[in-house]
Amino acid sequence: MNNQGRSILAWAALFIFVILLFNVFQSDGLLGVRNNITFSDFLTRVDERTINSVKIQGRVIEGTSNDGSTFSTYSPDYPDLVNRLTSNDVNIEVVPLETRMNTFLGFLISWFPMLLLIGVWVFFMRQMHGGGKAMGFGKSKARLLSDKGPKITFKDVAGIDEAKEELTEIVDFLRDPSKFQKLGGKIPKGCLLIGPPGTGKTLLAKAIAGEANVPFFSISGSDFVEMFVGVGASRVRDMFEQGKRNAPCIIFIDEIDAVGRHRGIGMGGGNDEREQTLNQMLVEMDGFEANEGVVIIAATNRPDVLDRALLRPGRFDRQIAVANPDINGREQILKVHLKKIKYNSTVLARIIARGTPGFSGAELANLVNEAALIAARLGKKEVDMHDMEEAKDKVLMGVVRRSIAMSEKEKRLTAYHEGGHALVGLYCPAASPIHKATIIPRGNALGMVQRLPETDEYSQNREQMESSIAVYMAGRVAEEIIFGKNKVTSGAASDIKGATNIARAMVTKAGLSDLIGPIFHGSSSDDMYGRQQSNEISEATAKLIDAEVKKIITQGYEFAKDILTKHIDQLHTLANALIEYETLSGQQIKNLLSGRALDSEEENKFPFNDAHTIKIDKEKLHEKTKTTKAQKENIAS
């Protein structure tokens, strides 16, 4: 049992002892055991003259018999009691109520609240600050990683080989510094892991702890600043002193953006305390005193908010980007996590990796775990590929909401809405392939068309972005064509938002507007309160931007309308199939519209000869929505 458990048991035993002591004194247990008798029996003994003396305190009567035995009883409101006792020669002693309580017991009860408060305060001070150091607020909360338990090594980290190589070099330096010092090299003072959430930054730190044969301390950025002024700076000093005593060692600071934000962007005492903590960290990392052998490794997914002084060489010499894995990285990560579950030969890591572009390592781990849970729920002994597909749909599209009972009218409208998305997506050559279309409510949506790129995408061209806008607008267009303009629903609100975001990014960030040109008009850096500031633009330019955004969205709207009008029969076919089957894969949709068997696995290049025709129509639509010179002058005025 650890010290904390023994301390809790000791305080519990003390509390029980005090309660027992209270009961003992209250029952006069230390003064002898008294025989309780009834009041009628007491009166009989008085009349028989067998009672020598009594002590009366309120309604409690304690007495001594002629043979020396003691007794006690409780008296009702009996006016003739005293006369009856004196007539039978019984000695009477009357005691005030206030003096009945034992002196020690009274002292204990009067001081008990104060003693309890002192005891609780001492208890918490011991627990929070290392066993009795009541003023230990400034002590570092860095935890030394124990050698007990399973170790995570670089073998458990997959898909981020570049980051592993950089960190392996640091581990090698700590193990054998002479190898690098022969050439005059110095160990890096700090290493910053940068990347989106779930890419394995903390896992890398755990692997370093498992690989390095040196002490490894870990702490969170939020552990420095608390309620007392100066605590953060004191904890930073104590952390580095702890590191120097155990050098060579590694100190890992997770989520360093909690304490390392830009100085001067906030107001108030809390911000001053955070800046004081950051200043102390800057001095400790690269100040007058050297920290030989103490390597700082930090992780963050917000490098844009970190102070520039923290990022300079000499503090964080290396900044390692930990990005989402590519298809090969995803395959390696899946193989690592598949080792932990039972699966059959139908599960192919390469196929799963190809169908999960953009997934982080944490999302892939969650995918494998969800598949195992689905298989267990169905009573299977092994996970198969169908379970993996179900898990992927759950992660991508959300949990199926079986509690929602859609009417036939809503189901029909949703089928045409999602059918419009899917059909336009098939006829847009630059759009990402359709993964699945469903009218089963998932997450916050009544239906969904999920698109997945065939390869990892790191940028998009104009045609891809325009195709995405057309696919976004296709659901609303389908509702308008089938049910009329007055029957269009609010279900396309999120689609309109997505299309607007893409169009505005094309105009203000990517420079893909001929009218505005390659000029950046997006949001700039944070202001002093941490809010995003937009670039200063004139009112005329703002109107031009709005006009260009509207033009691009209208162009996508007309493009989608042209496709759906031309292929209205296919829209009806697809919508009816969604009503019947509720969920269709991209391959099933192609088979359906090509007249093949729904579950045919033959390669199907759909559409056949329509892509060129649609491209020509798109150019006509561009001419239709083109901003004329007169319109430009009107907007500018």
UniProtKB/Swiss-Prot annotation:
Its cofactor is Zn(2+). Acts as a processive, ATP-dependent zinc metallopeptidase for both cytoplasmic and membrane proteins. Plays a role in the quality control of integral membrane proteins. It comes from the Bacteria. Residues 617-637 are annotated as: Disordered. GO terms for cellular component: plasma membrane. Residues 28-103 are periplasmic. Homohexamer. Residues 1-6, 125-637 are cytoplasmic. It is found in: Cell inner membrane. Its EC number is 3.4.24.-. In the central section; belongs to the AAA ATPase family. Binds 1 zinc ion per subunit. GO terms for molecular function: ATP binding; ATP hydrolysis activity; ATP-dependent peptidase activity; metalloendopeptidase activity; zinc ion binding. This is ATP-dependent zinc metalloprotease FtsH. Zn(2+) binds at residues 417, 421, 495. It comes from Rickettsia typhi (strain ATCC VR-144 / Wilmington). It is a multi-pass membrane protein. PANTHER family: ATP-DEPENDENT ZINC METALLOPROTEASE YME1L1, METALLOPROTEASE M41 FTSH. The chain crosses the membrane at residues 7-27, 104-124. ATP binds at residues 195-202. GO terms for biological process: protein catabolic process; proteolysis. The lineage of its organism: Bacteria, Pseudomonadati, Pseudomonadota, Alphaproteobacteria, Rickettsiales. The active site is at 418. Keywords: ATP-binding, Cell inner membrane, Cell membrane, Hydrolase, Membrane, Metal-binding, Metalloprotease, Nucleotide-binding, Protease, Transmembrane, Transmembrane helix, Zinc.
